[in-house]
Amino acid sequence: MKSLEPILDVFQPGLKRGAARLPFAPHKRYFYVEHPTEGWRVYLRACTFLHEAGQPFQASRFLVVKKFGANASQKTWEPPKGQMEAKDTSPKKSVLKLLHENVQREVEEESKVQSFQNLRHTGMVFQGREPDYPENHFFQYHIFQAYVTPEEIENALLEFEWLNEHPKAFARLRKDKREKDDLSWFSPRSTRLMGRWSPSIVAMYIHKYE
């Protein structure tokens, strides 16, 4: 469920850092920050809205990716997003820097877009709680924005086309790189949003900028 709590400040100094295995993916360790006295814990996630460089800005025109093997006409699309894992963190880097690096990795893995411009944190945060979270545990999606050239979009589409034509090669990719199998511009009718959180995140983003 979406949290009714105030948005917690994960950038404040003095927070503890750690990682935990969660029931839905016990083989991974997910990064969190925790307040040393108040006791709240936040698992960090990011969602990135990729717009076309050189075109007039339209909040509702952004790239989405499709869940691997799923029916494109169903609720199987979302902007590139993901959770920060322990392996992607460093105690010497700020939380904001770690989020930026996580976005760069997730965007490349999910959308095959390898180069984008003007990546920035929008200041928007979607905070919630998973049903199996202990009391005072939360997640936050930090909302990023970036711009992609038409050439880079075409390269990503060609890579997806090649991978879908060569399923054995696709299957050999690391699991994180084969979670999605198509790329498109968002359309409420033809690229319907998947999952519990993506529809709310997209609605929040469009509402802010339109």
Language model region names:
Residues 57-113:
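Conserved Nudix-box catalytic region and its N-terminal flanking loop in Nudix hydrolases
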Residues 50-52, 66, 147-150:
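Residue-level signal for short segments within beta-strands and strand-turn junctions
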Residues 2-56, 70:
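Acidic, metal-coordinating catalytic segment for phosphate/diphosphate chemistry
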Residues 30-39, 130-133, 168-173:
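Short, P/G- and charge-enriched loop/turn segments at secondary-structure junctions
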Residues 72-76, 80-82, 137, 143-145, ...:
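Nudix hydrolase/Nudix homology domain
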Residues 47, 61, 182:
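Conserved beta-strand and immediately adjacent loop positions that scaffold enzyme active sites
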Residues 114-125:
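A short coil-to-beta-strand element that immediately follows conserved catalytic motifs
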Residues 43-47, 138-143:
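Short hydrophobic/aromatic beta-strand or adjacent loop that forms the aromatic wall/cage
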